A protein has these predicted regions:
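Generic long, charged, amphipathic alpha-helical segments
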Residues: 101, 118, 139-143, 179, ...
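Charged, glycine-interspersed solvent-exposed loop segments at helix/strand-loop junctions
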Residues: 5, 14-38, 201-229
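Short, ordered loop/turn segments at secondary-structure junctions
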Residues: 12, 95, 125-126, 162-163, ...
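Terminal amphipathic helices with adjacent charged low-complexity linkers/tails
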Residues: 12-56, 246-275
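Non-catalytic terminal/interface segments that mediate subunit docking, oligomerization
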Residues: 51-148, 261, 267-279
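Single conserved hydrophobic/aromatic residue that forms the stacking wall/gate
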Residues: 1-11
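Phosphate/diphosphate-binding loops
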Residues: 8, 14, 132-180, 188
Length: 279
């Protein structure tokens, strides 16, 4: 006999499944239904990039979304909903990402691509992390799977760098080799290295030579210089790493405009028996 809690969980899961099915087309050969329900040019309020729930709610039509795999690897969160009436999937990456988080994102992207649903990546991550030396191999495999999932996906792929985009996560989720369009908020930092690591590699001589400051102060000084001159959003735009620097309040409107533009996208992969998924 099922307990009351088990019955409630079954009802909740059934309702969530029904909501997910309502967002999916009948097959990959059909477009998902477009439902007009919200102002497409609506501005979003000032939101901390780290507040994923508030940001996703502000972007979605009516503030409504469905989170999938919520109990697993919270450094990557994945949602489904509508934006400008279009069915979309959202991958929100924040903090340091584990191998499990990368695999969670890869699985979700492949699920969205099965039905040709656009994927929007929200990036505010300072790189990847491992719990132990033994997990290093798992991390490499997970990174390969994430890159594979984004590279193979033919559905529209948009990215917004809301904070930091450091290392491999940016390359897979928001890099111009994979994303159709990448936007950045003005304060974004986009780099292969963290500012602290960049100082250790690129500014070691300057830190030693700066006798007017302590070592910690000199490191902080050159970390700020690295962000300003190399890793900031303006320099990323100049180098073609992002397509545009946008007003955060207009993020929803810019994404919907991009979805409308990419609505007729019909991409295909080269003919072959199957892709060689990194196992």
């Amino acid at each position: 006999v099922r307990s009351r809690r088990q019955r409630q969980m079954c009802i909740r899961d059934s309702l969530k499944a029904k909501q997910v099915l309502a967002l999916l087309p009948s097959s990959n050969l059909e477009d998902s239904e477009i439902i007009d329900s919200d102002d497409m040019s609506r501005l979003i309020p000032a939101i901390d990039a780290a507040d994923v729930d508030a940001l996703v709610a502000a972007l979605m039509d009516g503030g409504a979304s469905i989170e999938l795999y919520a109990a697993y690897e919270p450094s990557v969160r994945v949602f489904m909903g509508r934006m400008g009436g279009h069915s979309v999937g959202v991958v929100a990456a924040s903090g340091k990402l584990t191998a499990g988080a990368l695999q969670k994102a890869a699985r979700f992207v492949r699920f969205m691509d099965c039905f040709g649903i656009a994927v929007i990546s929200l990036l505010n991550t300072c790189g990847v992390t491992v719990d132990s030396v033994n997990a290093q191999g798992w991390l490499f495999k997970a990174q390969s799977q994430l890159l594979f999932a984004y590279a193979e996906a033919t559905a529209p792929k948009l990215a917004v760098v809301t904070g930091d985009a450091i290392g491999q996560a940016y390359v897979a989720m928001g890099g111009k080799a994979n994303a159709d369009i990448t936007y950045a908020w003005p304060g974004a930092v986009i780099s292969a290295l963290t500012p602290e690591a960049a100082v250790a590699v690129l500014y070691a001589d300057q830190v030693k030579a700066d006798k007017d400051l302590s070592v910690e102060e000199a490191r902080a000084k050159y970390a700020g210089e690295y962000v300003e001159k190399v890793a900031g959003a303006v320099n990323a735009a100049k180098d073609g790493m992002v397509d545009d620097i946008i007003d955060p309040a207009k993020t929803r409107a810019m994404l919907i405009s991009a979805l409308e533009m990419l609505g007729s996208k019909r991409d295909s992969n080269p003919p072959k028996k199957h892709d060689n998924l990194p196992m």
